Every structure is written in structure tokens, then in C-alpha cells.
Amino acid sequence: TNFAATPVAHPILANLTLIGNGGSKQGVRLRAGTQVELYNTLITGKGQPLTVETTETETALKEGVSKLEYVAISKTLSSKEGIYTNDMFAAATGNLTAQNFTWENLYEGTIDGGKDLSADSFFTKAEYKGAVKTGDNWTSGNWIKQ
């Protein structure tokens, strides 16, 4: 398999709260040449909340083609190749490891301090990590199945 084949998808994702089922396996798994920009995100509920693997994926992170910024995880980053390590992740802008998250109503909660992405008109300014701020539950209402 050629993990350097083109075209390469490169999504930009921001203000996510990802809570796993408490299992011991991986939560977010970046591999197979994946490129991504992930900002203002909370990841918890898995034995390995954030795993990176394959030379191409880890090299893109190390060289800044892919970015993980203002990402808080409940344990440490797992690196299969050792190219992009937990120390590199922890040193990146705004990242936090070994966090104990507190939730209201199952999934409400954020951590102050996030990347302002409002220069891109697609994003709304949200200077916090996570998706749903306590007391500002935008998920309630008629658009979501209750």
C-alpha cells in the first residue's frame, strides 16, 4: 500500500469533544498517510485516546503539514513509529496530556484557551477546547433526536 499516494485528504476539524466507551483500545487513530489539522479538541474515554502511526502520517505531523493544536487528551499520545512523539505533541501550542475531564449532562464541558479560527469565515470564534460549553448547550432543540 502506498500511503504517500495523491490526492491526500487534509480535513480541518475544530471544537470537538470525543468521549469513548471506556474501552482499552484506540480513540482517535491517525494513520495510512492521513493529514489533518485538529484544533480545540478534547479526547477521552479510551485506553489510547490519540494514536499516530505510519511514517507518512507521523512525518506530516513532525514537519507541520498536519497540526494538532489546543488538543487535550486524557492520557498520552501513542506513537507507533516514534517520529512524532508524545513529547512533541505536549510541546505543541496549547496541547495538554493526562487530563481529568469533568462533564455536565454527559458531555458539556470545555477547557479555556483555544485557537481563534474566525479568520476563516467557516469557523465561529470559540476560544476554548471542546464542543459544548457548560451552560451554552447548542445541541439542545429540535434539530437533534432527544
Name what the model sees in each region:
Residues 1-146:
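Extracellular beta-rich repeat passengers
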